[in-house]
Protein backbone atom coordinates (compact mmCIF):
# COMPACT_ATOMS: atom_id res chain seq x y z
CA UNK A 1 0.00 0.00 0.00
CA UNK A 2 2.79 2.43 0.90
CA UNK A 3 4.59 1.64 -2.36
CA UNK A 4 1.43 2.40 -4.33
CA UNK A 5 1.00 5.72 -2.50
CA UNK A 6 4.62 6.67 -3.19
CA UNK A 7 4.24 5.70 -6.83
CA UNK A 8 1.06 7.77 -7.05
CA UNK A 9 2.79 10.80 -5.51
CA UNK A 10 5.80 10.41 -7.82
CA UNK A 11 3.55 10.13 -10.87
CA UNK A 12 1.46 13.12 -9.78
CA UNK A 13 4.58 15.26 -9.29
CA UNK A 14 6.03 14.05 -12.59
CA UNK A 15 2.84 15.20 -14.36
CA UNK A 16 2.03 18.33 -12.35
CA UNK A 17 5.46 19.99 -12.35
CA UNK A 18 5.89 20.20 -16.18
CA UNK A 19 2.20 21.11 -16.54
CA UNK A 20 2.54 23.96 -14.05
CA UNK A 21 5.75 25.11 -15.76
CA UNK A 22 4.07 25.18 -19.19
CA UNK A 23 1.01 26.90 -17.71
CA UNK A 24 3.18 29.65 -16.20
CA UNK A 25 4.97 30.17 -19.52
CA UNK A 26 1.62 30.32 -21.34
CA UNK A 27 0.21 32.89 -18.91
CA UNK A 28 3.34 35.03 -19.20
CA UNK A 29 3.19 34.95 -23.02
CA UNK A 30 -0.55 35.67 -23.04
CA UNK A 31 -0.16 38.69 -20.74
CA UNK A 32 2.75 39.99 -22.84
CA UNK A 33 0.70 39.76 -26.04
CA UNK A 34 -2.25 41.64 -24.55
Swiss-Prot record:
InterPro entries: PSII_PsbM, PSII_PsbM_sf. GO terms for biological process: photosynthesis, light reaction. It comes from the Eukaryota. Pfam families: PsbM (PF05151). Keywords: Chloroplast, Membrane, Photosynthesis, Photosystem II, Plastid, Reaction center, Thylakoid, Transmembrane, Transmembrane helix. It is a single-pass membrane protein. It is found in: Plastid, Chloroplast thylakoid membrane. GO terms for cellular component: chloroplast thylakoid membrane; photosystem II. The chain crosses the membrane at residues 5-25. Its main location: plastid. Belongs to the PsbM family. HAMAP family: PSII_PsbM. PANTHER family: PHOTOSYSTEM II REACTION CENTER PROTEIN M. One of the components of the core complex of photosystem II (PSII). PSII is a light-driven water:plastoquinone oxidoreductase that uses light energy to abstract electrons from H(2)O, generating O(2) and a proton gradient subsequently used for ATP formation. It consists of a core antenna complex that captures photons, and an electron transfer chain that converts photonic excitation into a charge separation. This subunit is found at the monomer-monomer interface. PSII is composed of 1 copy each of membrane proteins PsbA, PsbB, PsbC, PsbD, PsbE, PsbF, PsbH, PsbI, PsbJ, PsbK, PsbL, PsbM, PsbT, PsbX, PsbY, PsbZ, Psb30/Ycf12, at least 3 peripheral proteins of the oxygen-evolving complex and a large number of cofactors. It forms dimeric complexes. This is Photosystem II reaction center protein M. It comes from Marchantia polymorpha. The gene is psbM.
